[in-house]
């Protein structure tokens, strides 16, 4: 039958040659269609598609709706294979334009029809589109009179929407049906005329505007009505003039053939001669056609094709039949039968040959494509809702291989040599474990909508099983998922990406059936834990790779090479694990979580090496079944492996004498479980292969030999840096179509989950143009698959977000859109060119060529309304002096205390830049030169390194890069300036540069599209040089020119820009440009020009303001101001009025110079006018150098700003100064001098003084009223070029916090904060040497790559939090400590006892040290100290004031044993401690005794001290004396206090006694070694001899700071922080509390450095095994001293340096926001207390802990109201309470110290005491400070009672009193006599009494006199007052 139809078509085509030049044998039309619901129902039944919702018997025309039926591509392809050339598509006018208007089309319907048309085009069927068939829009029925116009509009819409896909159009398919729809008209003729007019209009529109490439338009007429219709003038004219061919609806009744021929003959009467197309052919009652269809067609054509009338095609539906043999594929063919009955159809199916496979159909469809057709670029967009994203894998990027208890994975063990390039490992990788915020910022910069990442199984379950999940691991993924959600990014979580826990691999891994259960448990935990937020799950990522490379070739872990057995077994278990996991989710989680679970499979595309060889074609298909079908077929088809794969393995095994490959079999139950066990098919694809058939000539198993194929590549395919990836973009389209036809069949969506290519390390690491081309071509092929092939692809996910560890390739292959600097410890990420390109694709959702619509600005910013200015000037000095009165007396602690809170909800967070500093392109695209271009190109400009802004950051060419940064930062606003000379090259509006305008339009549109608010500065110092050539700002014409430029900007950009600033920092423009001449134009006229320039600038600003106000404000609704700059001025002596006035004057001369005229009264500040006027007069000038405004100008200037924009960076200390008069100078006019406090932190340009910001904001409010304020610049310049910029973090942290205080505490109306600057740039005279950027710019790289600094991440965090809210963990906790909690206070013998030589005491090393010059601050000594040796009673009072139950003190070794040995025991000294202990016990205070607190007897030091191993025995003997003599009274012993300090400070750096510093690399370790052994011996002595009888406890007190990493996202810093704590606290704790030996960190570091320095062993001594056993466990509790926290970071010392610090390799700093103390090393960091207590719990197996010291110092303290100490104690003790809540076994707390004392090398300068000791009073009284009362209340309350529960009695206490001072006999002078103090006091009292008596006597006499006088005047008038009484 196929052959007969070929003959028919050849015969019919012969008609097309009869006298026509339009048709040829190639374009004879054979058409099918249209789609009807009935047809779709039948087709869906044929294919077994139960998802289709078509009703049987519904013959209505199909109205397009999404999604298209999945079987259509297959149906259309079969039609094409049957010689069908065209297909009819009926549009639905009513559905496309439901409202009747082309302004509101139904876009979904439009897109649906486009997909349908593209599907036809893909199948090589040409669409024939009918504009209207039936059902008019309701709106047209009410407007009949305009029907023709309405139809014309609709036709125009259709031509525009679909014309690129359609070549043949029909206006109407049934005129009679349309007439029925029209409202009643007078006559049929008028109805026909209406339709004719509508058709004519459409025809004319089409041929005038849309008929490109030979498009045609017609109308369909019924054949039987031809004679009648041709008599109607409208139709006759239509047929002659307005059709390209005539179309007929023909019903051919074979019984009445003659009648039809007669009617058709009328066609010959039409002139000119027409071409005829049989649009619709019906053959009722024609059984003969089944036998001979050709005869029927020939008879029809004979009737038509006469006299040059030509038939160009016909409808072939009557001869078409479609069938299916397997419900998997469809076949359509032309048949002689008119209609097959059901029984006939079944017979037909059984006799049909097997249909072509999906692969064969795709190959046939594409094999003959021309290169031009194959590579044709499709300009279109992806469907709405398409997901764009990037991917990573856990083992590729996370690092943190041992963090948080993570278990070892199979990728973790170091591989054998040469396994990975460069011996790369993944311990750190890209360090994503610490960089969640950074990675999410990258995604935000990309505008990604989905992020595919994998979960590390061993990070969740370290041993692979779910008995004990790792909480830190769970927290990491929770943090990542939460951050993604906050950023609006969909998480796609992969459960398994090749990194099996090693613990499971040790039991066989994926070859052990039990791993399926383990995986299911792991997956179930992930679903339960993360599934509330994760809605896209991937069970396995590329299981083929794991099976092939991990178990087949052994290239990947676990390194098993068994391709015939292991790889198939592993795949088998993976599939079962996947299926069980999917069903578990489906049953247990889907109902609540509504997520989707799929699998990601990888596949190359395969094509035959020799297309003419059928065996190569079959091998190509087999390749796909082996690679993709191995996993896809069981899941997506029938639950089993592909038949091709099974057959091939069976054949292979038959050919060999033994089984080469063993393919496991699924049970029927397993098949049912597998089938359909995926909600989507994830696909990753990178390249294509050419495949040839491989003869079976070997029985050695390999992947290729088992598959029977051989892989090749076409060498013309471009090669990437990876040997296995060639660029073959069209392969992805074909693969997607194959997947759609073979597996998903439109029922399951496809997620493209991996596509990309690597670049090599030797390539340009930032300009990856090859990858850009790769993405461009591959993504476009995906678009073709969706649009032209109707493949249901839902996502495109690029591989990968960042560079990572690439398995065997190590780090040599870079797949990242972002470069990772693996040589930098911060693992900084920098976007590549491909990242920006990918963003552009995402923004356009594909490939748009049309210009984007202009966007409206984001409406998230609440702009203030216009504000009123004052009408009167500020006073001199201004009333703002109250700011100094309020703040200058603040204590430093109060001033600097960090405040927690947030800003207003609509607070505007931004970053800033300026045109000249970043744009570059100085002469590009018609830009004119500016004064800065001229200045930097002029020799001698004094710009460092002769730098210019010619390129700068190249922002003019890197707009995408800048927008990427802004999105990543999450800023709400971007402040930038417009280059006047880029817009107007000559400065005048007659020279508009369209390229410059376009740049700013694109910038503004990009900002608005990213929801970032543009803040635009019109002038940022870069005046067009052409205007400078006419005098610049000294020329009055500049005011008009500036107004013209501004007007243009308002008009051009104002629809999107709502925040304008006229000038940036005009003070610097005036002074630096025209005063000092440092800036261009370089005028040096300091006394006159600055004032003139400022005068002009103020007037120019006012002019522009009024222009905006009058012309644009009402429509654009923006605000306009100018950015003013100043620093804060702090009076050097706040109590000296002249200094306060000088500070105020400085502010008026800088800020008030411009702010006073604008925000107050239109004129300069009086202080300026006064000073400049007076000095001008003193300089003998006729008038003031300060110009004056006219009254009219004042009115014009006043109130010309809507908000106050402030730039501020630093502060100065100011005092009054009388400067020289001549030469005149603006600087001297201020009559003040400035300086900086050297203690302020230094920067590259100025010292930081953040507290000045708060004061400045308050001053502005006082001076200018409660006006909305925006900080438009604030930042810090550093010379450090690296991405680590902790100092910048501190700067922004403290400055923003001061702004927060101003907003929250002072009521300042602060609306926004804009950081300077977005990125490093050209910093004026500093060139590129000073870096202000949150982003680092590499100016040595032509690509100017931008890399986020640590400060960028911090600033994003501030923005996200909208300030600095108190973290939940830092909130104050109300509660009580456990019953029995011990409260104590501490001291130490040498620090308080004094009596250094009393009663036989021997010398200690501290006696010697303090008597040595230059050892102790202020030459202080401890000879007397607090004299506690003589003041037991007074010390008891201090303890009773505190209410403590315990007192920790130390015993002086040299007071008990003067020479350090037991040869002589000093009973007097011993008796002191007996009396002290008895006194304590009598007061119910328990002693806690420290045996050794640093004061070694000097005699022992003389023989080496702690470096001499004999000290161990000496210490044991000394302890024995104490146990024996005091043990019955003392039940709490501490052997050593802070051995770290003894070893490190005493023997390392020599800053403490004994001052040894010449052996820093060995002595500390030897001393530490002996200290540990001495402790152990003392402990064993007590344990063995005394514990049973005395019942006490004994341990050691170890001190340690807590260490936080300086950069928590930097693995090196994290490890440095750990190392800091292990070298400090762990040095001594690890041997005693853990295993008897030093920690591995110390041992490894010191050994490695010792060997590197040439030593043959470690400098750290080793314990013998017996010593380890004796040391281990020598504790009853953990005594712990803690004061502060540090920020630690890695610091590598040269190996030649031998010291403890060099071994530790850590540097430390303090956060500037941490409150200071009196000690340089002690910052108040309460949070660290809780953290280190928890660390002790975890590290040392939860020992009982007693805090044996904690407190804070104040330097030179005299105020008893020690609020800082109260803050310290309150917060630290509260953190201890939280630790108790954390289940830390904390038993007691000891405050350091009970009273001020001798603080070692700082002498008496630092005071830690809760009692003030007055050292200037010989009696040394102990006076309680406020902190003593506070601590006593905590002790009484045993914590912090909740005030919400009411007042608590424990909070009330009697006032504590000072201790009683002894009476001393001294002589004093009294009335010229030398008397004792007692006698002088008595005499004083006597004299005082006599004076008092004398005064009383005089008063009595006066009273008597007055009374008597009054009585003598009783006769006087009552109205007269007595002089005395009135007095």
Swiss-Prot record:
It holds the Pfam family Glyco_hydro_1. This is Lactase/phlorizin hydrolase. SUPFAM superfamilies: (Trans)glycosidases (SSF51445). Broad specificity glycosidase of the intestinal brush border membrane that hydrolyzes lactose, the main sugar in mammalian milk, to produce D-glucose and D-galactose. The mature protein is composed of two domains that catalyze the hydrolysis of beta-glucopyranosides and beta-galactopyranosides, with a preference for hydrophilic aglycones (in lactose and cellobiose) for one domain and hydrophobic aglycones (in phlorizin and glycosylceramides) for the other. It catalyses: lactose + H2O = beta-D-galactose + D-glucose; phlorizin + H2O = phloretin + beta-D-glucose; D-cellobiose + H2O = beta-D-glucose + D-glucose; quercetin 4'-O-beta-D-glucoside + H2O = quercetin + beta-D-glucose. The gene is LCT. Residues 1902-1927 are cytoplasmic. Glycans are attached at residues 42, 368, 418, 512, 821, 934, 946, 989, 1174, 1340, 1508, 1656, 1672, 1761, 1814. Its main location: membrane. Specifically expressed in small intestine. It comes from Homo sapiens. It is found in: Apical cell membrane. Residues 44-286 are annotated as: Glycosyl hydrolase-1 1. GO terms for biological process: cellobiose catabolic process; glycosylceramide catabolic process; lactose catabolic process; quercetin catabolic process. Homodimer. Belongs to the glycosyl hydrolase 1 family. GO terms for cellular component: external side of apical plasma membrane; plasma membrane. Residues 902-1366 are annotated as: Glycosyl hydrolase-1 3.
